[in-house]
Amino acid sequence: MLDLALLGCGGGMPIPDRFLSSLLINYRGRKILIDCGEGTQVSMKILGWGFKSIDIICITHIHGDHTVGLPGLLATIGNSGRKEPLTIIGPEGIKQVISGFRTIVPYLPYDINIIENPKESLKIRLIKNSVEVLKGHNNSFMENKSSKDFARKKEVNTDGCGDHNDILSCDIEISTLELDHSCPCIGYKFYVNRKPKFNLEKAEKNNVPKFLWSKLQKGENITYEGIKYNPNMVMGRGRRGIKLSYITDTRPINSIIKFIESSDLFICEGTYGQDEDLHKAIKNKHMTFREAAKLAARGNVSQLILTHFSPSMMEPENFKQNAVEVFQNTLIGKDRFVKTLCFRE
């Protein structure tokens, strides 16, 4: 299962009881943060979700309401005792922003790996006290302090990590989509793999030696006494994972529909609640509640949570009906709202 917390649901500027954009994902004790607006650390502290285990920070774009919390957070992560490298993913310009922030926090006890404007999906493998990130045109795992001996070449699949070999060695896949905002901006999709079950009958039918079963279940390819063995020889059929999509600060472009298709949860900006504010949404390259709901309906998602509310909209719940009329299973996001996504049977 996947736990998530909306740390901040505001856009533009914080207001009482509403911090700026931030979402935290927790999977098997490792964390991914999406955006880091003002107040991110406060919400984390209130919830009691630790800082040290944040392995990846995904930034949608470099506007201040999505990034100004970064310097303080990076310092806090360092003060929490983290030594393992941390990965920051973002659009064009993120390297320059992080470089500027490092003048504020020049001394960190961990390395920062920056992936700017990724063109391929990124595969994440959970390891002890950290993660490994698969990136680059040769699809090799990034070399860092905790993964120098791990390098694999794999094909990238849009949803999930491909065949049994990939699924067994890849826990999460992160995909990005270029959006339509006033600066380079990307949306994120997270696919959590559900590993297939061991198939005893299949293993015996393929005459796989018992002492190789555990290695094959971990995704290894093995040659023993001149015979090649692979995970497909002992594993059952693939199982559906969990898909979470996150789209904010954009107009509702058509490419979003395919990107979010069949998501278990679609978190989307709803900067403006009233239909009458459509002209503002167009001018500022944002969305209304109704526009976000139309994307959810066309993308056939299971649930929509609206976030990134204009500071002028004090009570987003008052405009919920504008979204529900289009997509019934809509929730209005609130700071520190916590939800668990479970694997389907």
Regions found by a protein language model. Give the residues of each.
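Metal-dependent phosphodiesterase/nuclease catalytic metal-binding core
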Residues: 121-306, 317-326, 342-345
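Active-site metal-binding motif and surrounding structural segment of the metallo-beta-lactamase
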Residues: 39-89, 111-118
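Active-site neighborhood of phospho(di)ester-bond hydrolases with catalytic His/Asp-centered motifs
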Residues: 34-37, 54-62, 66, 90-91, ...
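Divalent metal-dependent hydrolysis catalytic cores, especially in the metallo-beta-lactamase
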Residues: 86-89, 115, 265, 300-312
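Short acidic, glycine/proline-enriched helix-loop-strand junctions
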Residues: 86, 314-337
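Conserved beta-strand hairpin/beta-sheet module of binuclear metal-dependent hydrolase folds
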Residues: 1-49, 83-85, 188-190, 236-247, ...
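Active-site neighborhood of divalent metal-dependent phosphoester bond hydrolases
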Residues: 82-84, 92-123, 130, 135-152
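Metal-dependent catalytic neighborhoods of phosphoester/phosphodiester hydrolases
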Residues: 70-76, 98-101, 314-322
